[in-house]
């Protein structure tokens, strides 16, 4: 098995991937805070790491994939109050919405989807260990982490303590300044602010966990003290992932993660502004899937290398749809030939081209999941396949091999060729077949005017007609 090379955010270089257990991968990806529908930017992370997971599975690895739900924090509390429902009710609503959206996008379910509120006992025990080891301290029911005590603090985000303290001092209020030993200390446990705020009993009084501690607890509980891969958006690199390292390694005295991976942002508009809820420039997956095919959105977002930014636009979505149509039309074309009565002949050149494409596909994906090069290798094969399918020397066995390989390659990107070929956007297949039959009848009767009229009608419907010795074929444009 050829080695995958991964860009490790911690070391800032590509490294050969070596799992802790040969043939098995432990993978943790930070999930959503479930106070609203996910937007396209949130979905980028889910799609990027699902694509990476699928490629590992394509190579034969067993992947244990854990992705959490943050179901309690300030945003959850504020939104629940605004909707006049409880925090658990809000969480249930948007967890279900998340699962519906990700299912529509053909994102594989996580092996486990732990929820922060289901792990309170373990969170409290984790915090107690940090206090006992001198890494945390309690102030009036709040518990803070002593960031400066952890000697590697700032390494993931490539910042030194002085830079971090200067940045933190600009954002801390007077009350926090008086409570914290240092501006860069962060909350592990937050005291209840009022009797109506959701809270749990703890050794420090009623309260709830901080955001960062939740992921440390859930990742180490379900994947062990050291994890192969930890992923998330670039915006989580600091402070969230930096704090996860500090918490986890202080508790376990072991390396927390071997490979840190961060996906790029989704941008919008000519200025390519980052999509975010705070900037009010976001589009939810829930809304966009009412307008476009889920496979188009999925393929569009999976077809850009995970570390690069994606510019979300209608034009780019149309380009993705056009590429999927090329795949679909090729599959339609070869299935016509496989099903017809033409005897099959052996084409060593086509088989060789398919095998060479597979080598190029694997080489590209092994290079930090270079999806653009991987897809280019497939695109370059399509004319070769179609040329064989349209020739008198058709190799049906090779066409079947191509279809099998294409199904596996596209599934890495979350595209199911059975669903792709079953799509009936616009006119349905029966209507088209009826018009094609009428045109064939007109041609047989040498009624060229009617034949041309039907061809023009089909063209307006987005259907291209091809007359071959084996009969009339049609494809959607």
UniProtKB/Swiss-Prot annotation:
EC code(s) of this entry: 6.1.1.16
Positions of short motif 'HIGH' region: 32-42
Known cofactor(s): Zn(2+)
Cofactor binding, note field: Binds 1 zinc ion per subunit.
Record keywords: Aminoacyl-tRNA synthetase, ATP-binding, Cytoplasm, Ligase, Metal-binding, Nucleotide-binding, Protein biosynthesis, Zinc
Top EC group: ligase
Residue window of motif 'KMSKS' region: 274-278
Pfam short name (any one): tRNA-synt_1e
Single GO cellular component term: cytosol
Reaction equation(s) it catalyzes: tRNA(Cys) + L-cysteine + ATP = L-cysteinyl-tRNA(Cys) + AMP + diphosphate
GO biological process, one term: cysteinyl-tRNA aminoacylation
GO molecular function annotation: ATP binding; cysteine-tRNA ligase activity; zinc ion binding
Binding-site positions, ATP: 277
Residues where Zn(2+) binds: 30, 215, 240, 244
InterPro entries the record matches: Cys-tRNA-ligase, Cys-tRNA-synt_Ia_DALR, Cys-tRNA/MSH_ligase, CysS_C, Rossmann-like_a/b/a_fold, tRNA-synt_1_cat_dom, tRNAsynth_Ia_anticodon-bd
Places the protein is found: Cytoplasm
HAMAP family for this protein: Cys_tRNA_synth (MF_00041)
Family: Belongs to the class-I aminoacyl-tRNA synthetase family.
Subunit record text: Monomer.
Protein name from the UniProt record: Cysteine--tRNA ligase
Biological source species: Lactobacillus acidophilus (strain ATCC 700396 / NCK56 / N2 / NCFM)
High-level lineage: Bacteria, Bacillati, Bacillota, Bacilli, Lactobacillales
Gene label: cysS
């Amino acid at each position: 098995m050829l080695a995958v090379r991964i860009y490790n955010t911690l070391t800032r270089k590509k490294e050969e991937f070596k799992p802790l257990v040969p043939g098995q991968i432990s993978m943790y990806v930070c999930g959503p805070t479930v106070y609203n529908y996910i937007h396209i930017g949130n979905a980028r992370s889910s799609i990027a790491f699902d694509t990476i997971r699928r490629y590992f599975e394509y190579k034969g690895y067993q992947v244990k994939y854990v992705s959490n739900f943050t179901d309690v924090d300030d945003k959850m509390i504020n939104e629940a109050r605004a909707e006049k429902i409880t925090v658990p009710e809000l969480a249930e609503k948007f967890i279900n919405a998340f699962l519906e959206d990700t299912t529509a996008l053909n994102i594989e379910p996580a092996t486990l989807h732990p929820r922060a509120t289901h792990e309170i006992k373990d969170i409290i025990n984790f915090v107690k260990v940090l206090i006992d080891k001198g890494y945390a301290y309690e102030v009036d029911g709040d518990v803070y982490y002593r960031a400066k005590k952890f000697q590697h603090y700032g390494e993931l985000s490539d910042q030194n303590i002085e830079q971090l303290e200067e940045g933190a001092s600009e954002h801390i209020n007077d009350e926090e300044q008086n409570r914290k030993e240092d501006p860069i200390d962060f909350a592990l446990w937050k005291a209840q602010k009022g009797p109506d705020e959701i809270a749990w009993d703890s050794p420090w009084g009623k309260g709830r966990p901080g955001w960062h501690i939740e992921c440390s607890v859930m990742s180490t509980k379900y994947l062990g003290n050291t994890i192969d891969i930890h992923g998330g958006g670039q915006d989580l690199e600091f402070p969230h992932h930096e704090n996860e390292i500090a918490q986890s390694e202080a508790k376990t005295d072991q390396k927390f993660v071997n490979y840190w991976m961060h996906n790029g942002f989704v941008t919008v508009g000519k200025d390519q502004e980052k999509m975010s809820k705070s900037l009010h420039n976001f589009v939810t997956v829930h809304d966009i899937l009412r307008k476009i095919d889920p496979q188009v959105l999925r393929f569009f977002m999976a077809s850009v290398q995970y570390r690069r930014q994606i510019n979300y636009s209608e034009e780019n979505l149309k380009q993705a749809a056009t590429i999927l149509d090329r795949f679909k039309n090729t599959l339609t074309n070869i299935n016509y030939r496989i099903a017809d009565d033409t005897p099959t002949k052996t084409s060593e050149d086509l088989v060789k081209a398919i095998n060479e494409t597979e080598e190029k596909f694997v080489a590209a994906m092994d290079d930090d999941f270079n999806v653009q090069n991987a897809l280019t290798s497939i695109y370059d094969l399509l004319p070769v396949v179609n040329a064989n399918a349209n020739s008198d020397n058709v190799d049906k066995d090779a066409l079947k091999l191509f279809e099998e390989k294409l199904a596996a390659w596209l599934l890495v990107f979350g595209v199911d060729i059975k669903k792709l070929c079953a799509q009936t956007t616009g006119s349905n297949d029966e209507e088209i077949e009826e018009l094609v039959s009428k045109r064939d009848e007109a041609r047989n009767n040498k009624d060229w005017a009617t034949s041309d009229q039907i061809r023009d009608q089909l063209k307006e419907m987005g259907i291209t007609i091809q007359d071959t010795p084996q009969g009339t074929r049609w494809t959607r444009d």
